[in-house]
Every structure is written in structure tokens, then in C-alpha cells.
A protein has these predicted regions:
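Alpha-helical structural motif
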Residues: 6, 37, 77, 108-111
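Charge-dense (acidic/basic), low-complexity helical/coil segments
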Residues: 9, 16, 83, 96-121
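Amphipathic alpha-helical protein-protein interaction segments
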Residues: 29-104
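Short, charge-rich amphipathic alpha-helices with coiled-coil/heptad character
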Residues: 5-22
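Residue-centric detector for conserved, function-critical "anchor" positions
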Residues: 26
Length: 121
């Protein structure tokens, strides 16, 4: 997925969760870039056969098994993205933290909270 599509998807998720703030746009942009890189690494990983280990020949001529660089990139991007998802309130822990700080928009216009409120729960 492209960076702009990721930006739209992330912003929509923030709005639905009630956590969107205008000043989060730069964080959303950074996260979208990370996810675009992850998607490209995923494509490369799949095109290479999806093997978690590859053979690598070092300068000395010795051949060793090593982690697939594309898989390493995917794992790194996922770890970095998780921190951003959390900061945006798009994980349970992140949502709770933003709620504790009073940064959640109560009039989000959807979501589980509105459904539960409509049911009187």
C-alpha cells in the first residue's frame, strides 16, 4: 500500500477511535512511511521465496546461513510501527493512556463506546 493510502487509513482509524488530533498528522505521516517500507520488504520477502534464512558468503569466502534481510526489515518496521500505533491510541494500552490524559474525543461518531451507550450499557 502506498504512503498516502496508509495515511488515510491511519487517520480514519484515529477518528473512529476518537483519538485524532490535528497535531498527530506528522506522526501519522511517519507511521505511513514505515508501513510503506514494510509492505515493500514484504513483497521482496515473498518474491525471494519466503525463506526465513538465506545463504550468505562473507569476504573471506565462507558461506553461512543468516536471517533473510527482508524478514529482518519487516520485523524492524513492525516493531517501530507498534510504538507509533500505541502513541496514536490505536492499541488497547495506547487508547487507555490517551483516555487517562483526556485526549480522547468523546464525540467520535462511532465505535464500540457509542454502540454500548446506545444499548444502555
Amino acid at each position: 500500500m502506498t504512503k498516502s493510502k496508509w495515511k488515510n487509513k491511519i487517520k480514519k482509524a484515529c477518528i473512529e477511535a476518537g483519538t485524532y488530533q490535528k497535531y498527530f498528522d506528522s506522526i501519522i505521516d511517519t507511521l505511513a512511511g514505515i508501513l510503506e517500507i514494510r509492505d515493500k520488504a514484504q513483497e521482496k520477502f515473498e518474491l525471494s521465496g519466503g525463506n526465513p534464512v538465506v545463504m550468505h558468503t562473507n569476504k573471506g569466502g565462507a558461506t553461512n546461513m543468516t536471517k533473510n534481510p527482508a524478514l529482518v526489515a519487516i520485523m524492524d518496521c513492525n516493531a517501530r510501527a507498534l510504538a507509533y500505533w500505541r502513541d496514536l491510541g490505536l492499541t488497547p494500552a495506547g487508547l487507555k493512556r490517551l483516555g487517562d490524559k483526556g485526549l480522547i474525543n468523546k464525540d467520535s461518531g462511532g465505535g464500540l463506546a457509542d454502540a454500548l451507550e446506545a444499548l444502555g450499557i
